[in-house]
Amino acid sequence: MTVTFQNNPVSISGSFPKVGDRLPSFTLCGADLNDLNNEDFKGKKIVMSIFPSIDTPVCSKSVKVLQNALMTRSDTVLLCVSADLPFAMSRFCTEHAVANVTNASFFREPAFTERFGVNLNEGALRGLAARAVIVADEFGVITHSELVNEITNEPDYDRILMSL
C-alpha cells in the first residue's frame, strides 16, 4: 500500500483497520509518561487522529479543528497519536490553548504503526506514521477509518463527525 508525501509515493506497511473491525489493541505513552491503552477509554467513543508530528502545519491544524468540533461531546475522546515526545505535545497544547485532547506517543511502542497499518517505510518521514483517522464506538468497533492519501492533506472532517 502507498500514500504520497508532497506527491511522491511512499510505501506503508501493516494492516490498516477497516470499518466494522475491532480497534486493535495498543499501548501508548501519555502526556504524564504513563501508559495508555484501550481499557483507558472503555465506554467512550474514540477519534484517533494519527499523524507524523504535531510540529507540522497540517498536523497542528487538524488537532485544532477536531478539538473544536468535539469540544462539547462528553462521550468522545480525541486521541492524538504521533512519534512526538509527550513534552512536545504538551508544549503545543499549552502554546495553542488546546484542551480536551488526549496526547499519546508511540515512541516506546514503534510496532504501533505496523499494527495500525500506518508505518512509513521510506523517504524523509521513514519511521513516522502516515496521516490517518480511526473512529471507534463505545464498544471498540470501528465506525470510520481514513488513511489520508497525501500526507500533507487534511482528513475529511465531515465524514469523521458523521461517523460518531
From Swiss-Prot:
Disulfide bonds join C59-C93. Its EC number is 1.11.1.24. It comes from Vibrio cholerae serotype O1 (strain ATCC 39541 / Classical Ogawa 395 / O395). Belongs to the peroxiredoxin family. Tpx subfamily. This is Thiol peroxidase. CDD domains: PRX_Atyp2cys. Keywords: Antioxidant, Disulfide bond, Oxidoreductase, Peroxidase, Redox-active center. It catalyses: a hydroperoxide + [thioredoxin]-dithiol = an alcohol + [thioredoxin]-disulfide + H2O. The active site is at C59. Residues 17-164 form the Thioredoxin domain. It is an enzyme of class 1 (oxidoreductase). One of its GO terms (molecular function) is thioredoxin peroxidase activity. The active site is a conserved redox-active cysteine residue, the peroxidatic cysteine (C(P)), which makes the nucleophilic attack on the peroxide substrate. The peroxide oxidizes the C(P)-SH to cysteine sulfenic acid (C(P)-SOH), which then reacts with another cysteine residue, the resolving cysteine (C(R)), to form a disulfide bridge. The disulfide is subsequently reduced by an appropriate electron donor to complete the catalytic cycle. In this atypical 2-Cys peroxiredoxin, C(R) is present in the same subunit to form an intramolecular disulfide. Homodimer. PANTHER family: THIOL PEROXIDASE. NCBIfam families: PRK00522.1 (NF001808). Thiol-specific peroxidase that catalyzes the reduction of hydrogen peroxide and organic hydroperoxides to water and alcohols, respectively. Plays a role in cell protection against oxidative stress by detoxifying peroxides.
